[in-house]
Amino acid sequence: MTLRLYDSATRAVRDFEPLEPGKVGIYLCGATVQGEPHVGHLRSVIAFDVLVRWLRRSGLDVTMIRNVTDIDDKILAKSAEAGVPWWAWAYRHERAFSDAYDAVGNLPPTYEPRATGHVVEMIELMQRLVDRGNAYRGKDGNVWFDVRSLADYGSLTRQKLENMSTLEEESSDKADPHDFALWKGLKPGDPETASWETPFGRGRPGWHLECSAMAYRYLGETFDIHGGGIDLRFPHHENEQAQSHAAGYGFARYWLHNAWVTAGGEKMSKSLGNYLTAAEALGRVPAVVLRYALASVHYRSSVEFTEATLAEARVTWERIAGFVTRAAELTGPVGDDGAARLADVVLPIAFVEAMDDDLNVSAALAVLHEHIRLGNTALSSGEAGDAAAELSAVRGMLDVLGLDPLAEPWVGEASATPLRGAVDVLVEGVLADRSAARAAKDWARADALRDQLAAAGVVVEDSPSGARWTIKGT
């Protein structure tokens, strides 16, 4: 089956055909590092991490670009309010984003360009647009993109100009209210360090210009996939496409957008004040549980983020990790070389078909859980060969989702909380006493100890390699 992806531009699921056979270029709009990362930020990065993993598992060479917007009006305002240099404020929060992305197991991008490191490319693109008649100089060093100069403006979101919301900043300097800033002239009170010299005067780049210039720098005039949150479609992505098309570039061939994380049915966002920071979420559950909660829902469906969502994800993850751990103890892991061997695992056809169907993770997880059921049956009956085969398939599928319990960084994650650690110690102590009773052929005491554990919800399974235990319902 050919990989099919939902293209937001055509509003249809399309066969994915790379621009260059065997290679894929992806540009993902990264963070504007104005504050702490929240759960919504993690959802977007995890969704595209799964895409990258699947493309690579399918044999494609992926170049993944995820930018950092480290110069922005909000960064300047918040840093000034805090009495901190804008660049220090941006860098501090950039590190917080990177740490959060790493914590939930995302692969690093091929390149992670900062906007401030690519101002030269932005000025060159801006000059090109002015020369081609698509941009004009306003007052005070501002440079505006002329939306009426581009016939297909609005094509990404299928809007006519007269019906569009005016979300760009108001200014008497503009020829049309919908025109947007390519460059913002230095204003009184702005820090001199947050500006660069151009033929049009000193200032700083507009948000939309930044992404077009960085995408061109790393992926060229035309590339395969542009991604981001659904809230970026307009005006950001519409304006990115407009700039790049006006410059004569093909830009993105497929547009992918992930849905929101919601709280109480509303988008989780800083502006609404209903968000949970990444640090707060990671303080509630292990990082792998948070990843499972965000990755287990189709990327185009919203995730309602509640305590029940996290609790369900925790139970499911512990069931997954429990099987993998028990099976690996009996049969050994897939191989000592870990990732290399997992990449060679033949994945179940139904799993492949689900992932090729616009990354249908929900259907893929149904296949995963069926193989875990078969694996548990094999373990119970002592069929080591069948258990090993199921372990191989399960770990291969989990690797695609970034959820393999035996891979970094998840080794030991299922028992990482202090409570689970304490339970481990107590249960292992009782099992040691039971083992001693069995060795002494004190069957009554051995049975009593097992009943004691059962009353506490701990299920004990005896096997040739010793007793294994799980918590009932996990």
UniProtKB/Swiss-Prot annotation:
Needed cofactors: Zn(2+)
EC number: 6.1.1.16
InterPro entries named among the record's database cross-references: Cys-tRNA-ligase, Cys-tRNA-synt_Ia_DALR, Cys-tRNA/MSH_ligase, CysS_C, Rossmann-like_a/b/a_fold, tRNA-synt_1_cat_dom, tRNAsynth_Ia_anticodon-bd
Binding site for ATP: K270
Motif ('HIGH' region): 31-41
Top EC category: ligase
SUPFAM superfamilies the UniProt entry points to: Anticodon-binding domain of a subclass of class I aminoacyl-tRNA synthetases, Nucleotidylyl transferase
GO cellular component terms, semicolon-separated: cytosol
Keywords (A to Z) from UniProt: Aminoacyl-tRNA synthetase, ATP-binding, Cytoplasm, Ligase, Metal-binding, Nucleotide-binding, Protein biosynthesis, Zinc
Motif 'KMSKS' region mapped to chain: 267-271
Sample GO molecular function, one term: cysteine-tRNA ligase activity
Entry's Gene Ontology BP terms: cysteinyl-tRNA aminoacylation
Binding-site positions, Zn(2+): C29, C211, H236, E240
Metal-binding is among the record's keywords: yes
Cited Gene3D superfamilies: Cysteine-tRNA ligase, C-terminal anti-codon recognition domain, HUPs
Reaction catalysis annotation: tRNA(Cys) + L-cysteine + ATP = L-cysteinyl-tRNA(Cys) + AMP + diphosphate
A Pfam family: DALR_2
Annotated compartments: Cytoplasm
Top-rank lineage group of the source organism: Bacteria
Family recorded in the similarity comment: Belongs to the class-I aminoacyl-tRNA synthetase family.
Subunit structure: Monomer.
Record protein name field: Cysteine--tRNA ligase
Organism of derivation: Beutenbergia cavernae (strain ATCC BAA-8 / DSM 12333 / CCUG 43141 / JCM 11478 / NBRC 16432 / NCIMB 13614 / HKI 0122)
